[in-house]
Amino acid sequence: MKNDSSTSAAPMKGLVGPLRSSEPARALPAVPPAVYLLEEAADLLVVHLDFHAALETCERAWQSLAEEPTSGTVVEVKCSLCVVGIQALAEMNRWREVLSWVLQYYQVPEKLPPKVLELCILLYSKMREPRAVLAMADAWLQDPDNQGLPEYGSLAELHLLRVLLPLGRLSEAEGLAVGSAAFSEEQREAVLQAICTARQQHTREHLSSQEQQQMSQEGSFSHKLMSLLRLLRRLWDAAASHLLSQPFKKSLLAALILCLLVLRFDPATPSSLPFLYQLAHLFRRIQKATLSRLYPLALRD
C-alpha cells in the first residue's frame, strides 16, 4: 500500500508542486478524454497491430475534442491523433485517403500542423505520388502565419527535394530556394546544387528520349518501306504469272479483236464490210488448215 500511495502521488507532485499547510489544496486540471483515447489508439497501432481499431479510436477521440476549448494540450493531442491515424491508414494500404481524412478535421491545408504536413509529404513521396500533395504543400508554405514557424525551413526544403524536383518543376524549386529567407546559406547552397543536378539529369533524359524517338521513327519508316517493296514484288510476280498463263493470252487476243471491231469498225457501215469479209475468210482458212492437219484422212475422203 505504501508503494501504491507513493506512486499515485508522484504525478500530483509534478503537476501542482509540494503542498504547504498554509496553502489550500488546488484542483488538478481535468485531462481530456481524448488523451486516454490517444494512448489506446497508439497501443492498438504499435502493440496489437489492429490498424482498423486504431483508426476508429482516433476518430472517436476527434469527436470528443470537438467540445473541448482550444488549448495547447488539445492542439498537441489533435496532431498526435492525426499522426496515429495516418500511420494506420498507411498500414492498411489506404494511403490515398490520408489527405481527405486529415482535411476533414483541419478543413484547410494552411491549418495543418507542421508534423502532419511533413508526414504527408514523406508518405506520398515514398509512394511516388508527389503530385497529390503538391497543392497542399504550396498552400501551407505560402501562408504568412506559417512562414514564422521554426519548422518552416525544414518543410520548405523537404517540399523542394521530395515534391518539386521529382515532378520536374525546376523553376519553382529555384524560386523557392532563392526567394525564401527561411534557408540558411548552407541549405540554400545544397538545394541549388540539387536543382542543378536535377536539371542536368532532366536534359540528359530529354535528349535520350529524343534519340529513341528518332530511331523509332527511322525504324518505322524502314519497316514500312520494306513492307511496301515486298508487296510490290508479290504484285509483280502475280501479274507476271498471270500474263504468262495460256487462258490470259486467249482472253487478251479476244479483247484485242473486239476492240478492233467495236472501236475502229462499225458493222453497220458499208466501208467495214470488206474488212469483215476478209477477216472471216482468214478465220476459215486458219480453221481449214488446222482441221486438215488433225484429220487428213477424212478431208481426203
Swiss-Prot record:
What's the protein here called? Peroxisome assembly protein 26
Q: Name one GO cellular component term.
A: peroxisomal membrane
Keywords from the named record: Membrane, Peroxisome, Protein transport, Signal-anchor, Transmembrane, Transmembrane helix, Transport
Q: Which domain of life is it from?
A: Eukaryota
Q: Provide the membrane-side ranges marked Cytoplasmic in the record.
A: 1-246
Q: Where are the transmembrane segments?
A: 247-263
Stretches in topological domain Peroxisomal: 264-301
- What InterPro entries does the annotation carry? Pex26
Species lineage, top-down?
Eukaryota, Metazoa, Chordata, Craniata, Vertebrata
Instruction: Reply yes or no: does the keyword Cell inner membrane apply.
Output: no
Any single GO molecular-function term of the entry would be: protein-membrane adaptor activity
Q: Span of the secretion signal?
A: none
Q: Name a single GO biological process.
A: protein to membrane docking
Q: Which PANTHER family match?
A: PEROXISOME ASSEMBLY PROTEIN 26
Q: Principal localization?
A: membrane
State the protein's purpose.
Peroxisomal docking factor that anchors PEX1 and PEX6 to peroxisome membranes. It is therefore required for the formation of the PEX1-PEX6 AAA ATPase complex, a complex that mediates the extraction of the PEX5 receptor from peroxisomal membrane.
User: What family name appears in the similarity comment?
Assistant: Belongs to the peroxin-26 family.
- Per UniProt, what is the membrane topology? Single-pass type II membrane protein
Tell me where in or outside the cell this protein is found: Peroxisome membrane
This protein's record includes keyword Transport: yes
Q: Fill in the subunit field for this protein.
A: Interacts directly with PEX6 via its cytoplasmic domain. Interacts indirectly with PEX1, via its interaction with PEX6.
